[in-house]
Structure formats: C-alpha cells, structure tokens
C-alpha cells in the first residue's frame, strides 16, 4: 500500500483531534444508524451555512465533523456486514451501470 497523501494525513489528524475531545462519550458504535444519518444531515447543513457565512477555518471544522459522521456510519456498517449479507440492495452500482 502506498503512503496516504499529505492532505489526507492532515485531514485525518484533524478528525482524530475532534474525536479525542469526545472520548468520554463512549464512541459511536452504540449509536443507532437513524441517529447517525440524522446527525450527518445536520452536519452537512452546518457545513453549507459555514461555506456561505463563516471563515475558512470554520468551514474546515465543519467538513471534519461531516467526515467523522461518515466514518461512524462506515464503521457501524462494516461491523454489521455479516448480519446484512442476505439483504437485497436496490439501485446498486451494478444495476445502475448494467453489470447485473
């Protein structure tokens, strides 16, 4: 595997800094998926507002919040993959691109 790009490393460091500040809350794996989805929507809205009205630093901060919630969802889905294997996916990439 190649080394992550400098920008990715810097972004991940910002993600980790924010996560570390909230370690006392016990992580995200216990959070229900609907809560994570709604929280991601809220963070995206905050990012959109920041893009219009806030400083670059605030925009970057909101982008990190969005990324952290995306990572939470990714991690929760990864941990439930075995439970979800039998599910039928609608509009999968394969169906959309004619590779069924």
Q: What do the PLM-derived regions correspond to, one by one?
A:
Residues 1-100:
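Flexible "arm" and connector segments at domain edges
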């Amino acid at each position: 595997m190649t080394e992550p790009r400098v920008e990715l490393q810097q972004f991940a460091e910002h993600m980790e800094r924010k996560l570390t500040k909230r370690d006392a809350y016990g992580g995200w794996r216990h959070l229900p998926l609907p809560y994570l989805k709604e929280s991601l929507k809220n963070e995206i809205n905050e990012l959109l507002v920041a893009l219009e009205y806030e400083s670059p630093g605030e925009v970057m901060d909101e982008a990190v919040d969005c990324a952290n919630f995306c990572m939470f969802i990714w991690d929760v889905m990864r941990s439930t993959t075995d439970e979800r294997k039998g599910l039928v996916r609608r509009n999968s990439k394969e169906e959309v691109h004619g590779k069924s």
